[in-house]
């Protein structure tokens, strides 16, 4: 590449002085007439260290005058010459050419002059010196200053993983300056440079991609600098396994027994569910061990409890409610009146749009759901949800799923512990808490309903379970609802109320929870709030949980920092999707708490969150995007736009092979499977659409793991063991299916898992450290006994899911 630079000095001539002489003789005593010619005299100033080989000149002028000749060159700092015999005239031009001995520079300059009288003229010639190919040109106006030349830049190695360093080395020369006189300035489009004013800096990669490292070398003249660059590649760290891409798909509000309570695994596999435990029979009717899931009503107590002092088993289960499920088809929301209206939904295949037009209850809101067989006289345990008048594609009522409520519903006490159930959680207060904590309809007995996969319910997820690997010991990390559990999926921890700079402060008192019962009621909460300082055992609701944790043999750390209030129930982030900070309403203050997004970004590993409805704004779930709470990913538009995407963007990335290493994806509100507002079959359709998109890109599919799971159990009953890990959970089991070429075979895994297991898998697969010193991903993998693979003997312990894979397939 040719570079043109301007220097302040002149190679040729300082001054070319011309004088008119009265004739050619130097003898002043001779009286003759002038011959009407003159002569031109000049001194050639040569810059230090520059050795000229030749200096040629050409003079052209009036009446066709032309003369070309050479000047004798002496190896000195001044070369003098006189050019005689130039006729009087106006408008002469002299052109000088000089070349250095090493032939590295050829200089050319010209000037005009007149010989029209006896006075002396001075003429300056500005010469342009062209260095040999690729070095540039020089405009000279005095003593020569040749620009430095960058001869080359080497980068070793030319490609490294993010976090590693590349050695850069440049060579530069300047024919009229010593090497020590040159200054170096390096710049980079990404990463950090050590030694950026030396010839040999080191680049440390911080982000994946092509990085340009640029060098400017100067000899001190602001107008004279040489520039050159080199491109290097900072690559993402290679995964430890054949899994190069992970997609985490998160639906809403279904427990394992609610979804797979009747599932029968392939031969050679076992599963823990309602059917295998004899709680129900194969036809869904009460089984011989139905009492294991019997529900009870607690007696009144003065304060909040997580295990009542006394309780009475229901004779008849409180009936299921239609709650807020849609009563009829609607033109602007599911279930739509026709397929044209349903076509506004772009995140499922056209063949599945009909699901958005069916399933209205045909009943008023918040009444007994008589579509359930024998709804008003159900026995006091699990019941089959679907039947002759309740098809699988029907919308059903929601249930309560909040923090203090779920602690009560699971009824945990060390006094109830057994070797198979050392936590002592009986899970026998689900309908009672739904009925008692509030006067509103919160699902009543809907929490005990289950689908029947053996009668055609949940067909696509059953197919995935039959084909790939499923866990029957996966749990929601947080007792309660959507927002806090999505936070666990990213932070591996609860989110604190802070001043925005990481310092804990108290939220407004009106937001604090007080689950103590109101006077004269049986468990009607005083304030169903969203925040608690769980380091304060005297705070409402806190003491009962801390006392239980302290009584457990393994004494789990509550993980409650001093004077810190934690997010327990759904509250929107301070940031809107476009990065604007909310100024009104209730929201979680911006946080700088670290998440898996920080861990990935620190190592240059690509990741995105794909939220259904993110682009169009309708149906998008803010509390389902844990990264939207973080200042580091929301305040800067470029960073936000890099990571926050829509489902349609995921479809494009899959098709183009540009899927990041780690993807979190949550469907819009119509497709997330949430009771009342969605249907489980719609979440199946969403997952099926994504897997079909992957099928169309076999190369990408071959290295991709799709994790199909849920945020929480939604307040539905589950019979599985619950491990108390800290103040915040765990909670009930939820489905987890791993879809990849390395999880085939319909195997059922029993290792104890929760949402943080997904973080642990990502960290192990890419060699990442735990997110923080207090996050749950610090806990070890479970150690179990052969006779009870569900209960870790080293509690608290959470699997990293690696034992669900066979990388030899």
Describe the residue ranges of each PLM region.
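Bacterial Sec-dependent N-terminal signal peptides
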Residues: 17-50, 96, 117-147, 224, ...
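Extracellular acidic, Ser/Thr/Pro-rich low-complexity tracts
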Residues: 46-48, 172-177, 219
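Structured interaction patches on ligand/partner-binding surfaces of diverse proteins
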Residues: 70-74, 99-133
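Short Pro-Gly-centered beta-turn/loop motif in secreted/extracellular proteins
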Residues: 77-93
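Proline-centered linker/hinge motifs at extracellular inter-domain junctions
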Residues: 148-150, 201
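Solvent-exposed loop segments of extracellular immunoglobulin-like
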Residues: 178-185
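Surface-exposed, flexible coil segments in extracellular/virion-facing regions
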Residues: 185-203
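N-terminal pro-sequences and low-complexity stem/linker regions of secreted or lumenal proteins
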Residues: 235-809
């Amino acid at each position: 590449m040719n570079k043109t630079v301007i220097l302040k000095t002149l190679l040729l001539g300082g001054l070319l002085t011309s004088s008119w002489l009265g004739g050619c003789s130097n003898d002043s005593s001779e009286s003759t007439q002038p011959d009407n010619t003159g002569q031109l005299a000049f001194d050639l100033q040569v810059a230090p260290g520059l050795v000229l080989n030749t200096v040629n000149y050409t003079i052209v002028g009036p009446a066709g005058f032309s003369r070309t000749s050479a000047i004798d060159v002496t190896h000195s700092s001044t070369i003098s010459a006189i050019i005689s015999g130039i006729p009087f005239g106006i408008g002469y031009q002299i052109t000088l050419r000089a070349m250095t001995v090493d032939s590295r520079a050829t200089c050319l300059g010209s000037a005009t002059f007149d010989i029209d009288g006896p006075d002396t003229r001075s003429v300056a010639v500005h010469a342009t010196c062209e260095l040999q190919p690729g070095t540039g040109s020089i405009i000279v106006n005095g003593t020569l200053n040749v620009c430095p030349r960058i001869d080359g830049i080497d980068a070793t190695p030319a490609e490294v993983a993010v976090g590693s360093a590349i050695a850069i080395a440049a060579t530069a020369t300047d024919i009229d300056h010593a090497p020590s006189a040159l200054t170096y300035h390096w710049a980079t489009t990404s990463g950090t440079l050590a030694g950026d004013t030396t010839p040999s800096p080191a680049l440390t990669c911080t982000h994946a991609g092509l990085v340009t490292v640029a060098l400017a070398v100067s000899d001190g003249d602001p107008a004279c600098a040489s520039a050159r660059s080199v491109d290097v590649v900072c690559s993402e760290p290679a995964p430890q396994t054949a899994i190069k891409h992970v997609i985490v798909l998160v639906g809403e509000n279904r427990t394992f027994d609610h979804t797979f309570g009747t599932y029968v695994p392939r031969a050679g596999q076992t599963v823990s569910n309602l059917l295998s435990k004899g709680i129900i029979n194969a036809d869904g009717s009460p089984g011989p061990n139905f009492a294991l899931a019997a529900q009870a009503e607690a007696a009144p107590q003065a304060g909040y409890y997580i295990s009542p002092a006394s309780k009475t088993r229901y004779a008849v289960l409180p009936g299921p409610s239609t709650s807020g499920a849609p009563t009829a088809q609607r033109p602007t929301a599911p279930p739509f009146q026709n397929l044209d209206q349903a076509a506004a939904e772009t995140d499922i295949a056209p063949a599945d749009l009909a699901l958005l037009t069916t399933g209205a209850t045909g009943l008023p809101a918040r009444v007994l759901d008589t579509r359930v067989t024998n709804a008003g006289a159900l026995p006091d345990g699990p019941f089959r949800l679907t039947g002759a008048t309740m098809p699988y594609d029907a919308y059903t009522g929601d249930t309560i799923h909040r923090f203090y409520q779920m602690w009560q519903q699971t009824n945990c006490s060390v006094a109830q512990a057994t070797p198979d159930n050392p936590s002592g959680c009986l899970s026998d207060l689900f309908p009672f808490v739904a009925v008692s904590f509030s006067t509103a309809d919160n699902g009543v007995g809907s929490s005990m309903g289950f689908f029947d996969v053996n009668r055609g319910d949940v067909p696509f997820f059953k197919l995935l379970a039959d084909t790939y690997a499923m866990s029957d010991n996966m749990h929601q990390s947080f007792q309660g609802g959507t927002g806090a559990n999505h936070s666990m999926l990213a932070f591996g921890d609860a989110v604190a109320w802070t001043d925005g700079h990481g310092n804990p402060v108290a939220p407004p008192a009106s937001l604090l929870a007080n689950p103590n019962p109101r006077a004269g009621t049986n468990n009607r909460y005083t304030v169903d709030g969203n925040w608690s300082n769980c380091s304060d055992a005297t705070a409402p609701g806190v003491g009962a949980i801390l006392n239980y944790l302290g009584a457990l043999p393994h004494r789990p750390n509550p993980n409650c920092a001093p004077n810190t209030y934690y997010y327990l129930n759904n509250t929107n982030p301070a940031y809107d999707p476009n990065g604007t900070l909310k100024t009104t309403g209730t929201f979680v203050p911006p946080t700088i708490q670290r998440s898996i997004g920080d861990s990935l970004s620190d190592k240059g590993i690509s990741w995105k969150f794909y939220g259904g409805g993110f682009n169009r704004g309708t149906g998008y779930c803010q509390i389902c995007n844990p990264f939207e709470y973080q200042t580091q990913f929301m305040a800067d538009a470029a960073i936000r736009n890099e990571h926050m995407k829509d489902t349609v963007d995921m479809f494009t990335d899959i098709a183009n092979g540009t899927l990041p290493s780690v993807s979190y994806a949550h469907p819009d509100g119509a497709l997330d499977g949430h009771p009342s507002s969605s249907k489980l079959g719609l979440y199946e359709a969403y997952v099926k659409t994504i897997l079909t998109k992957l099928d169309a890109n076999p190369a990408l599919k071959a290295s991709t793991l799709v994790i199909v799971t849920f945020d929480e159990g939604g307040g539905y009953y589950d019979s599985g063991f619950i491990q108390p890990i800290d103040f915040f959970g765990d909670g009930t089991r939820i489905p987890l299916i791993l879809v990849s070429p390395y999880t085939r075979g319909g195997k059922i895994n029993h290792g104890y898992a929760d949402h943080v297991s997904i973080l642990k898998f990502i960290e192990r697969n890419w060699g990442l450290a735990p997110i923080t010193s207090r996050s749950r991903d610090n806990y070890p993998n479970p150690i179990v006994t052969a006779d009870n693979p569900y209960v870790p003997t080293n509690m608290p312990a959470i699997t990293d899911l690696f034992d669900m894979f066979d990388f030899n397939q």
